[in-house]
Amino acid sequence: MIGNMKNLDIFDLRILTTLQRDSSLSQRQVADLVGMSQNACWRRMQALQAAGILVGSQARVDLAALGLELTIFVMIRTRHHARDWVDRFSRHVQNLPEVIDFHRIGGEWDYLLKVVTPGMAGYDRFYQRLIDGFEFDKVTGLFSMERILENRPADLNRLL
């Protein structure tokens, strides 16, 4: 069982895999699918939550169906790396509703944002707000032509 998170057993992995695929399942349904009693499953789910492994529960929304058809991966390079600049930039980006993922990355670029907008005009409005008040060395947008694989559950049995 849990204790040390490196000691996840097959039941813990089954619970996590099941919930990654469908977090709307009832506790009873999860227990049945992983082959445990409801009480034992509940205790393990509580332990996984307490350990910070099992976090939240979200429904996936098809943003394109809502008119947010353009997905852009925005890469940013800057020479500013002082903590106060990074904190200010981070707060700024987190207040831009078009940004659905935000990463500080290693390599040639410093930041990667995943952005959704209703179209090119929406992206231009977003871009103007993004750069307002900040100096960057380079900003580039990579436009997604097709979603081939998105939000795939991690194959925990093969990864751990």
Named regions from a protein language model:
Residues 1-160:
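A compositional/biophysical signature of low hydrophobicity enriched in polar/charged and small residues
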